[in-house]
Amino acid sequence: VIELIMDGVAAGRNWTVLKGNHDRMFDWFMQTPLRQDPHLQIGHSWLHPRLGGDKTLASYGIDASEGRRLYEVQREAFDAIPPAQIAFLRALPLTYQHANWFFVHAGIRPNIPLSEQLEDDLLWIREPFLSYQDRHPLMVVHGHTALDAPAHFGNRINLDGGAGYGRPLVPVALNEKTMRPLC
């Protein structure tokens, strides 16, 4: 998937690709020393089956099954994964602003200027963002918290239809005030 996206961007397609928490976890796994995201539950790492790192590495032919030594899996990853793909993930922007829209992976911390948002919040926040009902400076378009279908909440639009849980991606069309699923 990373190669497909990189090829599209290189070909000049008008795609905006934002960094998500799983992209950062992949990048951090590929660093020496290996970095662990502090937002993960104790006992979990990016390689935990719930987080998808094991499947990501399997797509490169790497066995990350339980019982293997982390340093061995990481060494195999260094050999198998093109450095350009990790550089691409590392360089992805955290946000994108267009007109009255503010696109971000997880959300924002309410009442903090958009220019002062922390990376951890942009990639991981749930509360107090999800329960905040007042207006944000811009309409926030996000994912990270799966719903049955995309939903408009007045001050934010959650586009996460649960693809991380095996459900299909849900493309949407956005105009100044509305959101319409395309399928």
Task: Give the location of each predicted region.
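Acidic, His/Gly-enriched loop-helix segments that form or flank divalent-metal centers
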Residues: 40, 49-51, 55-158, 162-168, ...
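Core catalytic region of metal-dependent phosphoesterases/phosphodiesterases
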Residues: 1-48
